[in-house]
A protein has these predicted regions:
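Conserved nucleotide-sugar donor-interacting segment of glycosyltransferase catalytic cores
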Residues: 125-135
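Metallo-beta-lactamase
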Residues: 1-123, 130, 139-197, 215-221, 241-265, ...
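Generic beta-sheet signal
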Residues: 137-139, 271
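Active-site metal-binding loops of divalent metal-dependent hydrolases
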Residues: 8-9, 63-66, 120, 200-202, ...
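Cap/insert and terminal regions of metallo-dependent hydrolase folds
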Residues: 67, 82-100, 213-334
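Core dinuclear metal-dependent hydrolase active-site scaffold
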Residues: 2-5, 41, 47-53, 174-213
Length: 334
């Protein structure tokens, strides 16, 4: 089995969306800051993951964004999202479009049999239009959230981005406990791809565990934006889901912490990691679809430099905002 990292665009986000959960970016106050803070932007990558499964064929985890989302905002978005999302929210080149990313590996979008969605947010479902024949798998709880609106007016799901799906596969997590998780879903019945419920970022958010030869890869979606978010008591994303969802988000990350302790060969692949972890390790190491022993050792060495005992960040590893240079709107997170 092989798994490839696909860089399918970038997105402009407020720094506080990624790192403000312990600094007042919570509840309605967090939503207000998310909508109004225009002076602390950072750019982060959007990734999808292509699995070449020996029996079940090509499997895509998340789909990224499409060309219209990035370049035709005013035509694509209507209603509340037209105003909530900035016109320059998404960045996408032709080389980053999902079909181009898949084709550079020698595959075609038409051959993708299964799509797993970690959740239904726009930067994860926009590319569904490129795989209209695939079966789309998502948590039943996420499907039930289709009609929900955050704070009563912001749609959790923009239906236009998912309307082309022909075959849905709702997941109810019926495969029993899996290490630190009370329930799971063995997607293909052979233990090779396990779906794990991680609500919090969204009601039906899930993670994808891919069991490789001698190690495991956990695709975290947005329950962990970056590897540093594993230290949930020190680094926390925006929390605007109410106390119940907020506690679910923290609990989901703690379950990932315990899973990491149970599976010593676990490699964590966060949803939007903009640090060296993504660009010096994950992207280049997954270019051939596998992680060699030497590459896994390099990843573990990086983790050792990042975390102290019990998963706390080492001094100096805490993120901070670097303001943009004069004349620019976007800074960076260091």
């Amino acid at each position: 089995m092989k798994i490839y990292s696909l860089h399918v665009g970038d997105t402009k986000v407020p720094y506080g969306q990624f790192y403000g959960g312990l600094a007042g970016w919570t509840g309605m106050r967090g939503m207000w800051r998310f909508a109004t803070d225009k002076s602390h932007y950072i750019i982060v990558p959007i990734h999808a993951y292509l699995i070449d499964h020996p029996q079940s064929g090509l499997v895509l985890v998340d789909t990224g964004i499409n060309w219209e989302q990035a370049h035709e905002h005013d035509r694509y978005y209507r209603g509340v999202l037209h105003y909530v999302l900035d016109a320059d929210e998404y960045l996408l080149t032709r080389e980053q479009e999902l079909p181009a990313q898949v084709e550079r590996l020698g595959y075609r979008c038409e051959d993708i049999r299964t799509v797993i969605l970690t959740h239904f947010h726009e930067d994860h479902v926009g590319g569904l239009r490129y795989v209209p024949e695939a079966k789309v798998v998502a948590a039943q709880a996420e499907w039930q959230a289709l009609k929900m609106k955050a704070f009563g007016f912001v749609p959790i799901v923009y239906r236009k981005s998912i309307e082309g799906v022909k075959v849905w596969g709702p997941v109810s997590f019926t495969s029993g406990p899996f290490h630190s998780f009370d329930t799971s879903q063995d997607l293909f019945g052979d233990g090779s791809v396990m779906l794990l419920p991680t609500p919090g970022h969204d009601p039906g958010h899930l993670c994808v565990l891919v069991r490789m030869d001698g190690y495991d890869i956990l695709i975290t979606g947005d329950i962990m934006y970056t590897l540093r978010h594993l230290a949930v008591d020190e680094v926390r994303a925006i929390l605007f889901g109410g106390k119940f969802l907020d506690q679910q988000q923290i609990d989901s990350i703690r379950r990932i912490q315990r899973l990491r302790q149970a599976l010593h060969g676990l490699v964590i692949v966060p949803g939007h990691d903009h640090t060296d972890y993504q660009y010096l390790f994950l992207e280049p190491f997954l270019a051939d679809g596998v992680l060699s022993l030497e590459e896994r050792e390099q990843i573990k060495a990086y983790e050792t430099r990042l975390f102290r005992d019990r998963g706390h960040l080492v001094p100096g590893a805490m993120p901070h905002f670097v303001p943009p240079v004069p004349g620019e709107r976007v800074g960076k997170a260091a």
